[in-house]
């Protein structure tokens, strides 16, 4: 069950005494955030707005929406990171899943006893990582937890940042991800080029995602070579507050033009196939907003992420593209 740190929210409201607040969180916990907004309204007697647009992480907080509503505080729930206060009026609130891992850890011990593994997870299960590491160690599995960097805690990964995994990849036999997210685990597999497994407490299984990740990379590579045939490109800047990478976009524009390509600069809040269908005479796109937009969605035309775009430039220069996803981060 998902447990939201409601105490922190009510403590902040009691201390700061805002006239109104806004709350948001990932889609999976939005009903709980909805209930919490109602609870704040009833208990504190202030408007509590539920920002129901998707929020994918600290790069996508929708603080603009909170500002439009004149909400004095925004509580972003479920995107744990090192920064408790993201900006002066944005509070990052923990939302943890308390499901036990005991049974699936037993299966993990049988499979990995005598091996060295990197233990990783996302926000929901970060509070369990030390306990699970100790249990594995006590049963003959050598466990390493990589150091966090920037917003990342030790052992924590985002969908686009993998520092705790990449820094120890040469010291381990495999990666073990706590949770259910193929999204995060496949990213770990690609960033480290190591066998990667999910410890899923809900299905009580140890599930390998290495082949799934390889298929992702094959599709991504195919899109790179398709894009190489395009004469006209659209380079897309994301308009969400943490995705505004104008300098990267301008760099790609110049380098594509140096290769003889025509480039349109485009700005979008939500980069979807439907929006891109409205644009004419563009053979391929590069988007510098979020790498997972490219790897996890289907588009009619190539829509390359930053790592793919860097590889595209190598293709255009007749160079080897290499393991382009094997990076600390994909931004």
Language model features with spans:
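Structural motif
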Residues: 23-28, 53, 78-79, 95, ...
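Short, charged N-terminal beta->alpha structural module
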Residues: 24-47, 120-147, 238-265
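Eukaryotic helix-linker segments that join adjacent hydrophobic helices
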Residues: 46-85
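Conserved, well-structured core segments that form the ligand-binding/active-site neighborhood
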Residues: 85-213
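Peripheral docking tails and interdomain loops at the edges
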Residues: 202-206, 211-214, 291-331
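Glycine-rich phosphate/diphosphate-binding loops that line cofactor/substrate pockets in enzymes
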Residues: 8-19, 108-117, 224-233
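N-terminal basic/disordered segments at the start of proteins
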Residues: 1-16, 20-30
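Redox- and metal-dependent alpha/beta enzyme cores, enriched for Fe-S-associated oxidoreductases
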Residues: 132, 183-263, 270-279
């Amino acid at each position: 069950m998902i447990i939201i740190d409601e105490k922190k929210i009510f403590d902040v409201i009691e201390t700061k005494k805002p006239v109104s607040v806004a709350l948001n969180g990932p889609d999976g916990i939005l009903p709980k955030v909805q209930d919490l907004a109602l609870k704040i309204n009833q208990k504190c007697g202030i408007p509590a707005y539920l920002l129901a647009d998707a929020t994918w992480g600290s790069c996508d907080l929708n603080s603009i929406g909170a500002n439009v509503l004149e909400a004095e505080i925004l509580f972003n729930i479920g995107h744990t990171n090192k920064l408790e206060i993201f900006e002066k009026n944005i509070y990052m609130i923990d939302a943890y899943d308390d499901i036990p891992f005991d049974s699936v850890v037993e299966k993990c011990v049988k499979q990995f006893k005598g091996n060295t593994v990197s233990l990783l997870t996302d926000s929901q299960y970060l509070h369990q990582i030390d306990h699970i590491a100790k249990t594995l160690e006590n049963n003959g599995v050598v466990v390493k937890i990589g150091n966090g960097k920037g917003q990342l805690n030790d052992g924590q990964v985002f969908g686009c940042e993998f520092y705790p995994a990449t820094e120890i990849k040469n010291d381990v036999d495999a990666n073990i991800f706590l949770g259910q997210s193929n999204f995060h685990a496949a990213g770990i597999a690609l960033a480290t080029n190591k066998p990667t497994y999910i410890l899923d407490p809900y299905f009580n299984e140890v599930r390998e995602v290495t082949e799934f990740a390889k298929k992702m990379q094959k599709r991504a590579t195919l899109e790179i070579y398709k894009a190489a045939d395009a004469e006209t490109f659209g380079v897309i800047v994301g308009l969400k507050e943490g995705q505004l990478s104008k300098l990267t976009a301008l760099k790609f524009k110049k380098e594509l033009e140096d290769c003889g390509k025509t480039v349109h600069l485009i700005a979008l809040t939500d980069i979807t196939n439907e929006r891109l269908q409205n644009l004419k005479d563009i053979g391929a796109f590069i988007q510098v907003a979020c790498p997972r937009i490219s790897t996890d969605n289907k588009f009619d035309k190539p829509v390359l992420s930053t790592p793919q775009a860097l590889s595209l430039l190598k293709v255009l220069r007749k160079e080897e593209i290499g393991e382009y996803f094997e990076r600390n981060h994909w931004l």
